[in-house]
Design a protein with these regions (language model features):
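ATP-binding N-terminal substructure of ATP-dependent carboxylate-amine bond-forming enzymes
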Residues: 1-105, 311, 372-387
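Short acidic-hydrophobic, aromatic-tinged amphipathic segments that line or gate anion-handling sites
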Residues: 50-57, 131-135, 164-167
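A conserved helix-loop-beta module that forms one wall/lid of the active-site cleft
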Residues: 95-162
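Conserved ATP-binding module of the ATP-grasp superfamily
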Residues: 126-128, 145, 149-152, 161-196, ...
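Short beta-strand-to-turn element immediately C-terminal to the catalytic PLP-Schiff-base lysine
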Residues: 133, 163-168, 200-202, 231-232, ...
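ATP-dependent carboxylate/phosphate-activation module, predominantly the ATP-grasp catalytic core
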Residues: 188-254, 258, 267-268, 278-306, ...
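Conserved protein kinase catalytic/activation segment
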Residues: 270-272
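Peripheral (often C-terminal) accessory segments that flank ATP-dependent C-N-forming ligase machineries
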Residues: 301-387
Length: 387
């Protein structure tokens, strides 16, 4: 089996996907613009061959690379990066080289937030009031329905990038004076907490691994206010969230992929609203958190499914609450690293520096903490972030 891994070096922890594929007997073909010598040794050892291009955004270079791989290794069976950024590129390459997976005719409904909304509504799933707006006049019509505050986000975008919270008409006018020339979705601001329905499906689209995350704060607020965030896996997925998550799975026909679905749980009603879908693993160190929460290896599980051997952990369970805790270097904290490890060293599974691309949301340094008790991980998170 031949697997083309786009940008296998990033995010840094995703090299483990390539290692797991090799361990399953798959031929792993790396494709990126990174210098080969800068790849970590474990990734080099996992790759059968690495093809370096001058620019990953030059589609013709990518086509030549896949042509080279096809000539030397035969039919290409899969291509992926596990990155939102390359979803469209992957889909185009799959279409042009007849590789199974998401194709170009499917990409809009998993990239455009407006198309996601349409799918949610068609499936009978509640969403925040809002729509694509053309101009200020159109936006003011929407305000009559929703009131302020509003959230403005690009129809195509990742995370909280280029997202704004608008409190009144002056800010709304300023937004239209300065917004980029792309479609923007305006929605009512929902007071609530983000929760997720995550997992992986087998080749038939059946979910074989499930997880849910809860966040201490919204990612948008964290980025806009330069705040701190922690988030944690749950040991049990709430029934209403799982029921809704499974409906979203059916609506989007997810096969042989990780998925990361985001919802709001409203403060006043406790009800759920669908926010967006992501056809990739949750970001940051979350895949490692899955491992620590369940004492399994999700990299191996994914590779086993790709290799046609099925999900290897049918009896898995969430043994721990597992929490990611971020710290930013522009803070004066109450506790230094030595004090953190003295207090919670028995619960800290992992800690590392975070790539600058993610630091605005996740912090410059991250700790992963686990315990069978939720109170323990929240207490540790608050201790680590105390200022």
């Amino acid at each position: 089996m031949n697997f083309v891994f786009l940008s296998p070096h990033f995010p840094p922890n995703y090299y483990q996907f390539a290692v797991a594929l090799k361990n399953q007997g798959v031929t792993v073909l790396g494709l990126a613009d990174e210098n080969y010598d800068s790849l970590r040794p474990e990734l080099k050892a996992a790759l059968t061959e690495y093809y370096r291009v001058g620019d990953m955004h030059d589609y013709n270079e990518l086509v030549r690379a896949l042509g080279y791989f096809t000539h030397h290794y035969g039919k290409l069976d899969r291509i992926d990066s596990h990155s939102e950024y390359w979803l469209e590129t992957e889909a185009r390459l799959r279409t042009d080289f007849n590789i199974p997976g998401i194709r170009t005719n499917q990409i809009d409904r998993i990239k455009r937030k407006s198309r996601m909304r349409e799918a949610f509504i068609k499936a009978g799933i509640k969403v925040a009031r809002g729509r694509i707006v053309k101009d200020l006049k159109d936006a003011l019509k929407l305000v009559k329905e929703t009131g302020y505050p509003l959230v403005a986000k690009p129809d195509v975008g990742v995370g909280a990038a280029a997202t704004y919270k608008i409190h009144h008409e002056i800010e709304l006018k300023a937004f239209f004076d300065t917004k980029p020339p792309v479609d923007y979705l305006l929605e009512e601001f929902i007071k609530g907490r983000i929760c997720t329905f995550d997992g992986h499906t087998d080749r038939e689209g059946k979910p074989v691994f499930l997880n849910s995350l809860e966040y201490s704060a919204g990612v948008m607020e964290t980025v806009l206010d330069d705040a701190l965030i922690y988030y944690y896996t749950l040991r049990e997925i709430p029934e209403d969230l799982e029921a809704l998550g499974r409906r979203v799975l059916e609506a989007f026909d997810v096969g042989e992929r990780f998925f990361h679905f985001e919802f709001f749980r409203e403060d006043d009603t406790g009800g759920l609203l669908a926010l967006e879908v992501n056809m990739r693993p949750p970001g940051g160190l979350t895949t490692d958190m899955f491992n620590y929460a369940c004492d399994i290896d999700v990299y191996n599980a994914w590779a086993s499914i790709i290799a046609g051997k099925g999900f290897p952990y049918p009896e898995y369970s969430h043994k721990y609450y597992c929490c990611y805790v971020g710290r930013k270097f522009n803070r004066d904290y109450s506790h230094n690293e030595q004090e953190i490890f003295q207090a919670y060293g028995d619960k800290i599974c992992h800690h590392e520096s975070i790539s600058g691309v993610f630091s605005r949301a996740l912090g410059d340094y991250g700790y992963i903490v686990r315990s069978p008790e939720l109170e323990d991980v929240i207490e540790a998170a608050e201790f680590i972030q105390e200022q």
